[in-house]
């Protein structure tokens, strides 16, 4: 039975990814969120639209490692783990950030990612014979942003950790990806930007990209950092270069 587990984020990317997998006909989707009301709303909408897919919901924070491990044990086997949960500190110069801002960013965006990935990889192998980890990251991991210093650093650190997990695993059995989902006009974004300031993305963009990553064609991208905007045919055309250059499309130092 194909099974997908998602940790959600409030901007709608997580829910859109759930819908994309449901559209593909997966047998089971498990959603984890701290907030019970949005969690129940997501369950009801998905169950109504795709009655053939089992929708499971669990309340909990990704920072609660014991809770995440318990949920994975209850699910027993999971084909695909999608990590969407993240925390973004208030916009401020690095000199104005508090130690708590930095600590919270790293606890949620790095340590929770590490613990959840490690716990998932320790679960039994599903009948499909492979596991997939999809980390919904941010361009902040690559682009310096002085007003989001801890956020960007934490997203880069998480991507680096996952690259290490990827290099230590047989890519036929375990595939691990990180990707930038795009820019979305949410209520939080509206506090700082106008709708016509840039061209905003549709949440279906990362949803369908995540679904493609979970499919059979993406194995050659194991351990890579990607953007949802990239054309998959162009990525496939880079397969030989990726095989020859382990550092290509990864987070690291360029000299």
Curated annotation (Swiss-Prot):
Binding site for NADP(+): 118, 151, 155, 186
Xref: CDD domains: SDR_c
Domain of life from the UniProt record: Eukaryota
InterPro entries reported for this sequence: NAD(P)-bd_dom_sf (IPR036291), Sc_DH/Rdtase_CS (IPR020904), SDR_fam (IPR002347)
EC number: 1.1.1.-
Pathway(s) of this molecule: Secondary metabolite biosynthesis
Single GO molecular function: oxidoreductase activity
Keywords associated with the record: NADP, Oxidoreductase
Active site: 137, 151, 155
Presence of the UniProt keyword NADP in the record: yes
Cross-referenced PANTHER family: ALCOHOL DEHYDROGENASE (PTHR42901:SF1)
Family: Belongs to the short-chain dehydrogenases/reductases (SDR) family.
Role description: Short chain dehydrogenase/reductase; part of the gene cluster that mediates the biosynthesis of the dimeric xanthones cryptosporioptides. The pathway begins with the synthesis of atrochrysone thioester by the polyketide synthase dmx-nrPKS. The atrochrysone carboxyl ACP thioesterase dmxR1 then breaks the thioester bond and releases the atrochrysone carboxylic acid from dmx-nrPKS. Atrochrysone carboxylic acid is decarboxylated by the decarboxylase dmxR15, and oxidized by the anthrone oxygenase dmxR16 to yield emodin. Emodin is then reduced to emodin hydroquinone by the oxidoreductase dmxR7.
UniProt protein name: Short chain dehydrogenase/reductase dmxR3
Biological source species: Cryptosporiopsis sp. (strain 8999)
Gene coding for it: dmxR3
